[in-house]
């Protein structure tokens, strides 16, 4: 693949995302550009050569700079400080939880609706992969509510390899897919090689469910011993968030009890647990390092779930106020994942007030 053609799918994805954000159909964008819907479809799939003039016209039609024309070499930012911030802002939904929930949607053959999903690049890439294997994904409104419909049989042979290789999160497909296919392959996950420290903990956990993975030609060749389940507690060799999530995803469709030790109790893991509970999976120990999961042989239910707010975004906003010596109001802060940091900042001289606690839309996470 040449350097030029390698950029076409990326530009196409940017055009598609900007069009959807603008609320336009392919036909409406085509009419604005004076071209055909099929041409717009080819552009979004990265199958159409584009001139700079056409890219500029698309950008104007969508009120979005698709490609920035800058100089070569390193970029530099000039920051003019001493600007005081003011006002109030709501913390948006967790990006990491959103990614985990997209992978978890593969467990459910019913309709999954996720509320206020963060439309980050990782989410866009995962959606490209999901739709390529047969999942129907629909953005419902401007609030970024997302509907997912997973078919009874996935077309894993049609997986979008280019999109899969641009996301490390593809490794979290192993957990749900090992129950849905006896043999399948996944492209290497964004620079993660089999046997490295970042990948091996996943394999160690998933072997308990009969998964065997061999790396060949930039793909994970996976085979599964159907009906295999843990005969003893799974001890994670790394207390990682995605490792814990992968083990949870595998345990959810194991019709029996799975004990996961050395699990991450982090916010995105808890959000995944709350979502799995809505699917009918029973989980004990949420928020601790030992999880006991009672899975099911199949899941087919209509579920509506809102991931909680992002503590990283909340702390970024608080930090912005601190360094600019500002007084702002940050609403919908997931306080249980920030109390230690705020206590340390208070010892350093930070003064702040906080409201009474209330629950997030998931009915579980404590906010202030």
Residue map of PLM features:
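Positions in alpha-helical segments
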Residues: 9, 13, 17, 38-41
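Structural preference for solvent-exposed beta-strand-turn elements
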Residues: 43, 52-53, 57-63, 68-368
